[in-house]
Amino acid sequence: MSLEPIKFEDGVAYERMMGVWSQLVGSKFLNWMSPRKGQRWINVGCGNGAFTEQIVRHCSPNEVQGIDPSEAQIVFASNREGAQIAVFQTGDAMALPFAIDYFDAATMALVIFFVPDPALGVAEMKRVVRPGGSVAAYAWDVFGGGVPTAPITAELRASNISYPLPPSVNASRMEVLYSLWVDAGLQSVETRVITVERTFANFEELWSTNALSPTLKPVLAKLPEKTISQLQNAVRERFPADAKGQITYSSHANAIKGLV
């Protein structure tokens, strides 16, 4: 089976599948950053604006810029009621359209492993942040089973079914993140693992939500019904429902921050 590149073209589907997870992690991440109010922020790879909205709600920023290569995601983000002060535009994480030392804080939420050259992406965040400002990111721990789609991808691997990975997937490793930050010349670098839980009303919700993932959707669409049924049964066995029929599981992200 040929693998299609992971594409983010549906802001609504992404909100249902990943937006909830993103905000669960994002809340803990922002508390860890402990930023001052009234700052200038840039959220690189803002996607559909889920994390940008959290910056607006929790950090009382003076300015927020959101950059993403997907026009569809930018359109969705621009219509978020909770992020109306933010300015969203399409752009390249490796060539940010801003002047040196302009921002107080730069973030990448679940993005760095999608940047073709992560080192250049970190260098660009550092370039546009003032001395003393913060450069921070978090990424699902792909190799440690921390990705929200892990219930299904684990069974795909067990069945020898291939699925696409982010182009710079090694950047999800904590040791790689640390090296990227240190090699960029950032100071006072700190790391932590952020673990969150999500509860699904039933198995059908768990499956249909994860099936919206741009990683899984094109793969599942090409599988015969018999294989889909076998995968579903395997996931049910791995994640049994509670007495109410609900299923709860955790995901975790590797987080890092440093000062310019």
Language model feature labels by segment:
Residues 8-20:
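Class I SAM-dependent methyltransferase Rossmann-like catalytic core
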Residues 20-39, 54, 58:
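Conserved alpha-helix/loop element of class I SAM-dependent methyltransferases that forms part
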Residues 31, 53, 57, 79, ...:
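Short, well-ordered alpha-helices that flank and scaffold nucleotide-derived cofactor binding pockets
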Residues 94-106:
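A short acidic, Gly/Pro-enriched loop at the edge of an enzyme's catalytic core
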Residues 3-8, 48-50, 169-260:
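Conserved Class I S-adenosyl-L-methionine
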Residues 119-120, 126, 130-201, 217-220:
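Conserved catalytic/acceptor-binding region of the Class I
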Residues 104-118, 141:
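A short SAM/SAH-binding and catalytic strip from SAM-dependent methyltransferases
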Residues 40-96, 120:
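Class I SAM-dependent methyltransferase SAM/SAH-binding core
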